[in-house]
């Protein structure tokens, strides 16, 4: 990799912050870092359009919350975006990354496993909207850095346990 490759990689990368979502077309790369949060990547193979959201919590406590940190709100807005752009949900694919159990507690603890809850609600909402989940790297006890390549819809995942995978 030479200097031009590195500069192109940086100029084509869009960072998605916690509680946010971004979308773009190929050749962009969308990037985020998750622990118990979940990165939701939705992709159209037709034209390289992709959307990445970084959710923190499963559901907004009140339905007045306009915040991408909640899976229910973020997924509904992502679907709305794809519909406005004319996409059929059945032609889209999704990939999920994250949902780790970062905060360890005793077995009797009343602290919920928020990572697992995040993964479950994302799966449920995507399936209810006829979006096929093509791949996942979820749960476990480690965070992950996600690079969503809009050229081909692949996710390069660098796990904090030292492993790397491509979804």
Write out the residue ranges for each language-model feature.
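Phosphate-centric recognition/catalysis
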Residues: 1-32
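Divalent-metal-activated hydrolytic enzyme cores
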Residues: 115-167
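Glycine-rich beta-strand-to-loop/alpha-helix junction loops that act as flexible
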Residues: 95-100
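Glycine-rich anion-binding loops of enzyme active sites
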Residues: 17-22, 101-106, 141, 145-155
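Short acidic-glycine loop/turn motifs at beta-strand connectors
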Residues: 25, 44-48, 149-152
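Alpha/propeptide regions of enzymes that mature by internal proteolysis
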Residues: 1-12, 62, 66-94, 105-138
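Conserved mixed alpha/beta catalytic, RNA-binding, or beta-rich assembly cores of soluble enzyme
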Residues: 30-85
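N-terminal intrinsically disordered, cationic/polar leader segments
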Residues: 20-31, 36, 44, 116-117, ...
């Amino acid at each position: 990799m030479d200097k031009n490759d590195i500069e192109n990689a940086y100029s084509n990368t869009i960072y998605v912050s916690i509680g946010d979502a971004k979308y773009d077309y190929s050749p962009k790369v969308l990037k985020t870092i998750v622990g118990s949060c979940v990165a939701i990547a939705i992709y159209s193979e037709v034209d390289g359009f992709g959307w990445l959201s970084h959710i923190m919590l499963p559901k907004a406590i009140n339905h007045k919350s306009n915040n991408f940190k909640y899976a229910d709100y973020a997924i509904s807005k992502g679907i709305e975006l794809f519909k406005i752009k004319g996409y059929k949900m059945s032609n889209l694919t999704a990939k999920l990354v994250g949902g780790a159990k970062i905060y360890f507690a005793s077995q009797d603890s009343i602290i919920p496993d928020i990572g697992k809850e995040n993964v479950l609600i994302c799966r449920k909402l995507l399936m209810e909207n006829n979006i096929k989940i093509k791949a996942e790297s979820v749960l476990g006890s480690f965070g992950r850095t996600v690079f969503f390549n809009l050229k081909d819809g692949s996710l390069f995942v660098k796990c904090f346990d030292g492993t790397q995978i491509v979804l």
